[in-house]
């Protein structure tokens, strides 16, 4: 079965809605990653993901760290993102979590599957199925109907 990959920032996590998010990142603060609100109904998302896993799908996160910053900052960003997932989706057992450097080709990092990402260039370079965040629930439900 395929892996279903989710981007975090701007896809399921509201990083860009955090006031002054860019200033925080430029000053190597992880606050926006910690303060981001969920962008969809996580109770429904968690239920759908568990059902899909029960039918053989794997689920994963593929997300970039900040565009700039020290190696230590990138490590703190990765930690903050993992903590965010644990706090907001505690019932989800992720098959993979890949937090990679900004600009990394996500398809080459993951090797395919289904991608949900807010960045059009990531969807365009994905050589398999890819969708915008607003399609998450609809697509997950349609996958369940197919199994």
Task: Locate predicted features.
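Asp-based, Mg2+/Mn2+-dependent phosphohydrolase catalytic module
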Residues: 114, 119-147
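Conserved beta-strand termini and adjacent loop/short-helix elements that scaffold enzyme active sites
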Residues: 62, 99-102, 133
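The start of beta-strands in P-loop NTPase/AAA+ ATPase cores
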Residues: 2-4, 112-113
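A short acidic, amphipathic alpha-helical/loop segment
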Residues: 44-51, 109, 125-129
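Structural alpha-beta junctions
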Residues: 55-56, 86-96, 127-133
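Conserved Lys-Pro-Asp/Glu-containing loop-to-beta segment of HAD-superfamily phosphomonoesterases
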Residues: 96-121, 126
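Alpha-helical substrate-recognition element adjacent to the catalytic core
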Residues: 3-5, 9-84, 88
